[in-house]
């Protein structure tokens, strides 16, 4: 099936490999975002470098959807691993996405749920299946599960313990996916999150992140490129 694929990464390092693979790319710079609209391996692709954090990701995702009209969204990049089976370089694939820093439980909502939105944003099952298949084919260790987002870099035992208490099944944490998922939900556009682990979230995760971000970017980009071949 020929689809146009929207790909979103927060940082330049997370989209650089994909950007270098693009041909016939038109560049759109708007509101602090960079959008590259072209092709990778004969697949129509719109690649967004959104900037870091949920607001930047939401702004960028909405602009990407409006300006380039992709059929589906893949969120790529790095994440902090909380699942015991995840190590640096491994792949995490979303089965659900939630905000970990939203709290309107005083009004009867679930932790992480925002009014007029579901508690969890569910990715497209076909996209999840394609991601799992390509990860297995590439030989990466992968975990599929809950990815939680917040406007905080998670390191330190206290933060980790709080997130695990609120979301016992959390596999990984990062800073954009829930915002991207929420915008996709609003626009009724299918999505999936496919990220590689740059750090195992602990008190030294900020040091690990700097060291292993290039590996995470490489591995997550490899899976995204493999996924594209399913839609050419």
Curated annotation (Swiss-Prot):
The gene is mtnN. PANTHER family: 5'-METHYLTHIOADENOSINE/S-ADENOSYLHOMOCYSTEINE NUCLEOSIDASE, 5'-METHYLTHIOADENOSINE_S-ADENOSYLHOMOCYSTEINE NUCLEOSIDASE. The active site is at 14 (proton acceptor), 199 (proton donor). The keyword Isomerase does not apply. Signal peptide: none annotated. It comes from the Bacteria. One of its GO terms (cellular component) is cytosol. This is 5'-methylthioadenosine/S-adenosylhomocysteine nucleosidase. One of its GO terms (molecular function) is adenosylhomocysteine nucleosidase activity. It catalyses: S-adenosyl-L-homocysteine + H2O = S-(5-deoxy-D-ribos-5-yl)-L-homocysteine + adenine; S-methyl-5'-thioadenosine + H2O = 5-(methylsulfanyl)-D-ribose + adenine; 5'-deoxyadenosine + H2O = 5-deoxy-D-ribose + adenine.
